[in-house]
Amino acid sequence: MKDMMGLLKQAQAMQAKVQDMQAALEQITVEGHAGGGLVKITLTVKGQIRSVSIDPSLLKPEEKEIVEDLVALAYENARHQAEQIMEEKMREVTGGMQLPF
């Protein structure tokens, strides 16, 4: 019974750490780039877009498809960075244990 109480306390402590980490992740931002920096997207580690920056040289009707592709690439670049940060933070909280969330 004593071991069970210890496990329960550990689980509660880990849950609190995960909640704290999730709140902290909302404040961390990453910036994705494409086209040599002509397109930039800033988003939170949780995936919320904070800003999109497009160099004025790309704002021509004939560049529309290129801009669309670059925006998508910049987003994917930022999302990849966000996923890496989330994985790193989760490892810090769980001590490297693989959890199903």
Swiss-Prot record:
It is found in: Cytoplasm, Nucleoid. Keywords: Cytoplasm, DNA-binding. The keyword Cytoplasm applies. GO terms for molecular function: DNA binding. Its main location: cytoplasm. The keyword Kinase does not apply. Gene3D superfamilies: Nucleoid-associated protein YbaB-like domain. One of its GO terms (cellular component) is cytosol. InterPro entries: YbaB-like_sf (IPR036894), YbaB/EbfC (IPR004401). Coiled coil: none annotated. Pfam families: YbaB_DNA_bd. Homodimer. Belongs to the YbaB/EbfC family. Binds to DNA and alters its conformation. May be involved in regulation of gene expression, nucleoid organization and DNA protection. This is Nucleoid-associated protein Bind_0255.
